[in-house]
Amino acid sequence: MGEGIKTFDCEGRTTREINAFLQETARLSPDAAAVLLHPDSRHNLAVGLTTPLRLHVEGHVGYYCAGLCEDVDVRVAGDAGWGLAENLMSGRVSVTGSAGSAAGATMRGGTVIVGGNAGARCGVAMKGGTLVVGGDAGYMTGFMMQKGVLIVGGDTGEALGDSLYEGRIYVRGRIEALGSDAIQADLTDADILLLAAALAEANMEAAPADFKKIVSGKKLYNFDTKEKEIWKNAL
């Protein structure tokens, strides 16, 4: 990260002390940078940062890491528990390893990158931004996704894109089953360009043309008595 980096050893310190250090460091300058050592899978690290900060976390983190953040660049050298980068507004959050359930849940902007696999309900209720998973993603990935882009380099579980409203899901591997009102669509030139840029940012070596595009069938937008069976399945 360069000179002027502030380092904090988490061993023996409370979560409140760690997050207070991050908040104070972020206030020092627009180019503030910090390193956390020995996080030991602690929950709720780097939550609620709304001032620009470049943060490197050396080790695994627990639940809700980097949630409710804005204008941050958080990089975790390890795995993350569930709720990674929940409700991210802007910036970038990445983990080199895998993430638990609901990675990127309700995110509104920015980029979330999971180098390994992601658990169930990855990208649930996304409202914007880009979520990239290098490996596999669990069941109900993209559930109730409203906006944004979700890219999976591996396979996905059942009910992919269930009750998808808007947004786009791209899957390179096998899709176990699509969810209610999720359909496969043809890739366009714009999709290829989008995928190429997102894959490059995530350092993923994959051909954009190898991905399948999943979008909303838009049959759940409005209730129609003629389609009550579709609604029964969705609910």
Q: Which residues does each PLM region occupy?
A:
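Extracellular/periplasmic carbohydrate-active domains that bind, remodel
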Residues: 1-4, 40-42, 53, 66, ...
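Intrinsically disordered, low-complexity terminal regions
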Residues: 1-45, 139-140, 146-235
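The right-handed parallel beta-helix/beta-solenoid scaffold, focusing on the short coil/turn
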Residues: 32-34, 43-45, 51-53, 63-65, ...
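Feature marks extracellular polysaccharide-active and adherence modules
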Residues: 37-39, 58-60, 67-68, 77-79, ...
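Residues that form or flank phosphate/diphosphate-binding pockets in enzymes
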Residues: 64, 102, 121, 159
